[in-house]
Amino acid sequence: MARSLKKGPFVDHHLVKKVEAAAGSKKPIKTWSRRSMILPDMVGVTIAVHNGKNHIPVLVNENMVGHKLGEFAITRTFKGHGGDKKSGK
């Protein structure tokens, strides 16, 4: 279910502070906040989003505005479907 428009977007306060401080920096901002929404202020900033094991660098562009950070750092690794174990035929 989508968030109500009257409530506005949710962004962790500490993440907003870090984005404002690192305006021209190339160093990625490390965050565990996958639930934060991407704002227009974050465009052009590299944010390292935690996926449960390590931080995945995400370069934010204009198409990502309105989505959440967790959408761009997948948590599961897909190994492929069953398939044939005899690959010699």
Swiss-Prot record:
GO terms for biological process: ribosomal small subunit assembly; translation. Pfam families: Ribosomal_S19 (PF00203). GO terms for cellular component: cytoplasm; small ribosomal subunit. Keywords: Ribonucleoprotein, Ribosomal protein, RNA-binding, rRNA-binding. GO terms for molecular function: rRNA binding; structural constituent of ribosome. HAMAP family: Ribosomal_uS19 (MF_00531). Belongs to the universal ribosomal protein uS19 family. Protein S19 forms a complex with S13 that binds strongly to the 16S ribosomal RNA. This is Small ribosomal subunit protein uS19. It comes from Stenotrophomonas maltophilia (strain K279a). The gene is rpsS.
